[in-house]
Structures are given as structure tokens and as C-alpha cells.
């Protein structure tokens, strides 16, 4: 397994607070859909509640504790009800391309025929992405721990 640095991203829409993003590369013998189902189960265990549709009322994004995406799976192109690979919007997202460029800058997107570094260089996204500050990466005490101090 390899992991990128963690990046801090400005919130989209009218959400508040920083978002933290990173990319990991893993090897697995699982089929892509099984891996995706396990990722969704992990989100549920961590407290993520998915709602129908990607956006809440009035077109605003919802805050969430965790969001796991399967960006690529070998060199496969997958289009099923629960899984689209490569991720259909990764080329529009600096918060995906910046950490991914650390791990696989030369990886070619099979549909767009462009490398990760080329997509990142050509991106016109207004959202700022920077390496995360160390204080954002330290575990925070739970409310219970904080109240006993």
C-alpha cells in the first residue's frame, strides 16, 4: 500500500470548514464491485449516512464524515449502477489530482488519454488545495475526553 500526503481543500458551496483529502494505492484480489461494497460498508461503520442523490435541496453539497471513492481499478473501465471507473469527475477535481499526482503522475486516464500530471496542469478549478497543516492531522479529543480535562 502507498499513500499520498494529506491535502486541505476549501469547502464547496456554502459548507464551512476545511476538507481533508488523500489517495491510497492498494493491491487486491477482490473484484472492483466487491471492493466498492466494502468501502461503502466502511463509510457506514464510520457514521456516514448517504442520501438519495448527490446534492441536498437547493443544489448544495452535504457535509460528511468520510467519503471513499474508487478512482481507478487497474486499467479497467467499469460502468455499473454502483460503480463508475475511472471516477467520472476525477479530472475536474484538484483535491483528487494533487494527491494522486504524488503516487502516479504518469498514469493515463483510459477515456481522456491524458496523464494525471497533465490533467492537474490543465485544471481550471477555482478551489485551492494545499498540504494540510499538522494541527489538522492530529487526532482531536472526543467531547467526553475534552469535558474531563
What do the predicted segments below correspond to?
Residues 1-8:
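A short beta-strand-loop structural module common to alpha/beta enzyme folds
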Residues 11-20, 28, 33-36, 40-149:
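Flexible, gly/pro- and Lys/Arg-enriched active-site loops
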Amino acid at each position: 500500500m502507498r499513500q499520498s500526503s494529506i491535502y486541505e481543500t476549501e469547502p464547496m458551496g456554502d459548507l464551512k470548514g476545511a476538507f481533508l483529502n488523500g489517495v491510497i494505492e492498494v493491491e487486491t484480489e477482490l473484484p472492483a464491485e466487491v471492493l466498492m461494497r466494502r468501502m461503502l460498508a466502511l463509510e457506514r461503520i464510520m457514521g456516514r449516512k448517504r442520501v438519495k442523490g448527490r446534492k441536498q435541496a437547493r443544489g448544495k453539497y452535504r457535509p460528511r464524515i468520510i467519503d471513499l471513492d474508487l478512482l481507478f481499478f487497474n486499467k479497467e473501465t467499469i460502468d455499473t449502477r454502483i460503480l463508475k471507473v475511472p471516477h467520472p469527475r476525477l479530472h475536474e477535481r484538484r483535491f483528487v489530482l494533487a494527491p494522486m499526482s504524488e503516487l502516479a503522475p504518469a498514469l493515463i486516464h483510459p477515456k481522456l488519454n491524458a496523464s494525471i500530471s497533465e490533467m492537474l496542469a490543465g485544471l481550471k478549478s477555482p478551489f485551492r488545495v494545499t498540504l494540510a497543516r499538522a494541527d489538522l492531522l492530529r487526532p482531536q479529543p472526543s467531547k467526553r475526553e475534552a469535558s474531563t480535562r
